[in-house]
Every structure is written in C-alpha cells, then in structure tokens.
C-alpha cells in the first residue's frame, strides 16, 4: 500500500493566512524553524497508478500539483484520482471537491450523515450536479468493510469516531454515528494495515483493538494542550469540545500511543498553534523521545 500525505495541517493550514500567533509570526519572520503545511488530506493506492483521495482539502490544486502521480498524462484530460473517501463533512475536508469539478463525475464514498450534511447545510452534491453529473454517492455502511474497484487490493473498514459535526450540519448538536469516521485500510496482498483518524476525540477499548491491529497509526495531532487555543488567545473552545484529543496530559494522545509499541506512529491534522510545528521545541523533542513522528506535506509511507 502506498500512502501519500498531501496535506498535514488542520483547518487554515500553517501559517494560517490571518494568524499572528507565535508559530505563524515566527515562521513568517524566519525565527521559527518549521515547514509550511497545507490542510489535511492523504491519498492511498495499491499500485501507485490509481489513487483513492481521502478528504478533499481546500488546498487540493496545489497538493495535486506537488505529487506527480496524480497527473499521469495518459489522455488530454486525466487524473490519478480514481475515487474519493470523505471522513466527515467539515469545510477543510470537503471544499476541495469544488476545485475538482472539471473532472466530474467523481465516485465519492461517505456515510449517510456526511451525505446529508453535503446535501443540505453545505449542498455540494446538489451544486456539482451541474458539472457532468457531479458526485456519484457510494454509501459507507458502518458495519463491515468495502472495496473500491479502482484499488481492488485495499480493504476499507470504517468505524465511527466521537467528534463534532460542522456548524452547518442539521444535527450539529445531536451527534450521530457516522458524523465522523476513521478507517482501517488493509492491503490484502502485503498484509500491511493503516489506521487513519485525523479527527479523534476519544479512544475506547473497541478503537484501541483496531489500533493494535495496525502497522501504522496516522492519527489526530491537532493540539498539544486541550486549552491551547484559549491560552494563545486565538479561540474560546477546548480541543475536546471540537472533537480533538490533545497530545499532552493524562489520557492524552501520547499516553494513548504509549500503549501501542509496535506500530509506526504519525501525527497529522496539526493546528497552527501546536508547538510541535517548531522543530526546535521541547514538545518536538518529546515526540522524538517517544518515537512519534510529525506528518509533513509530501511524506510517503509504504506498507
């Protein structure tokens, strides 16, 4: 299985266009050793030719331009994107669909809840019907697994995550299973397994079993501290309130990851306020001590 990190930041990217927190300002003036990051998205393939796009970031055009296999050049109009899987209906995971309109129709896999959000509060399915049929919906059932025909050796097993639906969702304050999902993706030839959950608010025992079964954990790295945005003066809500488990503190992501010594551990969906973006920070050193990696745009993983 080929895994390509197209974007590794949370919503807004890094540096965020309107933010002058210590990270964003430090990056701009050159005092912070860090790398710019686009908004979170990955691509998966079983042959390096046909790719499944997991989430469509607002930065999708730049991301595709930076990854040559996404433009194989086999025809006058072409793309390496064979299907799209949406983990949720958040703006930073779906807005890129608008930029892919010239390539419609697209095969899109998502849950009932996500499809409802994207047909009502943020009606991308309706809007894009005007471009060659738009988006062809394939329902993700939360029981069992599914295979996408373009990548027949990859088996996708979805699981519901405790996180938050977006503000425009009809059930914003009435959570449902399927508002947010994670994926366990297995290459049935190599046996390699990826656990992918860019928005992860809580890890229970059922979820821990899936993580234990994986060779690589690509998980929520949004915040270092739960009250990070409050302390930095850029927000009022905690990480948990937004559906993100912070890395630091009792029961945090680092403590969770300590329970899985075997898999490769990689953080993705990193907010611009997170001190791990500073490559010289003590927090980044703590990750290195724990053998936890920080995803970056253009990172490649093979399982």
From Swiss-Prot:
Q: What is this protein called?
A: Coenzyme PQQ synthesis protein B
Q: What is the lineage of its organism?
A: Bacteria, Pseudomonadati, Pseudomonadota, Gammaproteobacteria, Pseudomonadales
Return the CDD domains for the record. Answer: PQQB-like_MBL-fold
Gene3D superfamilies (alphabetical): Ribonuclease Z/Hydroxyacylglutathione hydrolase-like
Q: Any keyword Transport?
A: yes
Q: Which family does it belong to?
A: Belongs to the PqqB family.
Q: What keywords appear on the UniProt entry?
A: PQQ biosynthesis, Transport
- Its domain of life reads Bacteria
What start and end residues bound the annotated signal peptide?
A: none
Q: What does this protein do?
A: May be involved in the transport of PQQ or its precursor to the periplasm.
For this protein, the record's SUPFAM superfamilies field holds:
Metallo-hydrolase/oxidoreductase (SSF56281)
The answer to whether UniProt assigns keyword Transport to this entry is yes
* Pathway where it operates: Cofactor biosynthesis; pyrroloquinoline quinone biosynthesis
Any GO BP: pyrroloquinoline quinone biosynthetic process
Q: Which InterPro entries match?
A: Metallo-B-lactamas, PQQ_synth_PqqB, RibonucZ/Hydroxyglut_hydro
- NCBIfam families (alphabetical): PQQ_syn_pqqB
Q: Which organism is it from?
A: Pseudomonas syringae pv. syringae (strain B728a)
């Amino acid at each position: 299985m080929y895994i390509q990190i197209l974007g590794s930041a949370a919503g807004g990217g890094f540096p965020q266009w309107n933010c002058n927190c210590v990270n964003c300002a430090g990056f701009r003036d050159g005092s912070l050793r860090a790398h710019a990051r686009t908004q979170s998205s990955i691509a998966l393939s079983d042959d390096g030719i046909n790719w499944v796009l997991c989430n469509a970031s607002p930065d999708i055009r730049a991301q595709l331009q930076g990854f040559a296999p996404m433009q194989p050049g086999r025809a006058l109009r072409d793309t390496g994107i064979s299907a799209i899987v949406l983990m949720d209906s958040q703006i930073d995971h779906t807005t890129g669909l608008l930029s892919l309109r010239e390539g419609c129709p697209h095969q899109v896999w998502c849950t009932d809840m996500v499809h409802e959000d994207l047909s009502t509060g943020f009606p991308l399915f309706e809007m894009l019907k005007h471009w060659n049929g738009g988006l062809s919906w394939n329902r993700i059932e939360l029981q069992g697994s599914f295979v996408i025909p373009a990548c027949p050796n990859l088996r996708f097993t979805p699981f519901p995550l405790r996180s938050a639906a977006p503000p425009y969702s009809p059930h914003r304050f009435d959570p449902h299973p399927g508002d947010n999902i994670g994926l366990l993706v297995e290459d049935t030839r190599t046996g390699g397994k990826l656990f992918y959950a860019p928005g992860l608010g809580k890890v229970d025992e059922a979820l821990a079993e899936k993580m234990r079964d994986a060779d690589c954990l690509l998980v929520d790295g949004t915040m270092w501290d739960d009250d990070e945005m409050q302390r930095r003066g850029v927000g009022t809500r905690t990480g948990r309130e937004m559906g993100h488990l912070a890395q630091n503190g009792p029961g945090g992501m680092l403590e969770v990851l300590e329970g899985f010594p075997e898999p490769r551990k990689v953080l993705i969906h990193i907010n611009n306020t997170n001190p791990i973006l500073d490559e010289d920070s003590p927090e980044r050193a703590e990750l290195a001590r724990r053998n936890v990696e920080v995803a970056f745009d253009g990172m490649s993983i093979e399982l």
